[in-house]
Amino acid sequence: MMKIIAFVGMPASGKSEASRIAAEMGIPVIIMGDVIRKEVLKRGLEPNDSNTGMVATDLRKHEGMGAVARRCISQIRETGSELVVVDGVRGIAEVECFRKEFGKGFILISIYAPIEVRFSRVQKRGRSDDMNSIEGLRHRDERELSWGMGEAIDASNVEIENNFTLETFRKDVRDVLSNYLEADLEK
């Protein structure tokens, strides 16, 4: 059975770092935000927070709340891997879409970090679609919560707290992923 491990969490909680760790472990990673960023560029828009949010909302409005997840399923299958990590679930409809497609093989891991910690990270990472104030981060949190992010977080199988050092977080993520990787290898 194919196993999908998806990360869910508020912006800058550590999903991308967790995905980097998975990639270092040799696990293929599908980044849901890349679907949105690709669509932003396809529409000829500048890749900033406003346009990214507008396109994400538009896709969900016209294709349903599971639109981004549905666009990722073929990419997941194309990896040919029995274990794939998905970075960036944004709502309960996406969780339901993945659970319908992969059944018990879908595992959801939520990553938690307080807003002050997340904003500090946003300031350091310098992505073009990032927000430049804590109010901007709160606005993005509200937008993502409107997509069912809170329900998705509540539906997670495992929670990893990312409120400590990077080394602690990396160890926690490796431990959780190793458990699933070992279970996969034992089959």
From Swiss-Prot:
Coiled coil: none
TM segment ranges: none
Residues spanning the signal sequence: none
Cited InterPro entries: NTP_hydrolase-rel, P-loop_NTPase
Assigned keywords, A-Z: ATP-binding, Nucleotide-binding
Alphabetized GO MF terms: ATP binding
Name listed for the protein in its UniProt record: UPF0200 protein MM_1313
